[in-house]
Amino acid sequence: MLHCATFGFAPRGVSRDSYEVHHLSYSEWPDHTAPLDPTPTVALIKLARSLCNNNPIVVHCSGGIGRAVCFIGIDYIAQKVKENSDVKMVDMLKDLRNQRFQGVQGIIQYTFIHICVLELFVQDGILPREGKYTRFLNSYVHMLTRYNARMAEMATKEEASKKEEKKTRNKSASSHDKQSV
């Protein structure tokens, strides 16, 4: 879900006019992976562009390397491709990682950047929605859905294992207490 809040503030002891800050947040982007749908991310990028008035944009996520670099990378790569359509995504990723160590955490986020750049171009009328883009998007959604299901299954197994371990520990402690009495 996208959220936008606008704040005005004037720093104390500074004679400058007040600042206007737009805080945009996207709470549906899971950590270490990426959303299924590129549309909200592209909408957030377009909103950030429209609000910044050529002022700096600050981007952050909890760790500062995965989602933040993806978000920045989408806009950065889209601009680079518009300037020169011969740029290679892998070179752009290397460039991003030179600016932020370990930026973009794996193939899912890397693929999501591709999807979002293409979605930007589709929305801007540069690429058609039907055809290769739709097939690529469908493949991505299928792959990520399977990945998410596998991760959920692993988390469930891990949780069950921890419960069993705790139960075993409690039984062991309980039998030890009975023996010492």
What residues fall within each predicted segment?
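Cys-based phosphatases of the PTP/DUSP/CDC25 superfamily and their flanking regulatory architecture
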Residues: 1-181
